[in-house]
Amino acid sequence: MRSAARVSRSNSHPRTRHPTRENEGTTWGSQPSRTERDGDRKCPPSILRPRRQECGCHGGEPQKTSRHVRFREPLEVAVHYIARKDTTAAIKVPSRPASHGGSPLQPASCSGSLFLWLTLCALLGVVLVLYCGQAKRVTAALEDLLAQLLALILRLWRVVLACWH
């Protein structure tokens, strides 16, 4: 009766462990060593952790670990970058479609960006002239330009209508 009561009490309170033959090596506060937990592994599971001395991979000397990762661009990206920097190079890049504008040997946005820069410079010049106080001359010139553009648009419209009929 007492032995049955002791068994039921020991199962109901797992905190009060008494050393037995199966767990003589482990006491309540200690944990099993790393080799017991990992089994019979020769090397640690992580490649980022340094290797242990008992793995036997490189003898008795400690191994120097390098954690630097070097990323390299794919070859066609590097060639494309070099071709964009060197304007005399004629390298055909197969990843860019020819329908994107121009030939595959030329950058597609060269003419567009040049026009954009020239337009921007002209607008900045006009703003600078207006800011400096010569607004009367610039305003008269801009009004004349607007009148000429309207006349040109009307002439083009008449030509289109004449060709249509």
Curated annotation (Swiss-Prot):
Pfam family, one: DUF4658
InterPro entries linked: DUF4658
GO cellular component: plasma membrane
Highest taxon, organism lineage: Eukaryota
Assigned keywords, A-Z: Cell membrane, Membrane, Transmembrane, Transmembrane helix
Cell compartments where the protein resides: Cell membrane
Chain segments carrying region Disordered: 1-47
Induction: Highly up-regulated during 3T3-L1 cell differentiation into adipocytes. In vivo, down-regulated by fasting in both white and brown adipose tissues. Reduced in white adipose tissue in obese animals.
Membrane-related topology note: Single-pass membrane protein
Main location: membrane
Tissues/organs with expression: Predominantly expressed in white adipose tissue (at protein level) and brown adipose tissue. Also detected in heart.
Residues that span the membrane, as ranges: 112-132
The name this protein goes by in its record: Nutritionally-regulated adipose and cardiac-enriched protein
Origin species: Mus musculus (Mouse)
The encoding gene: Nrac
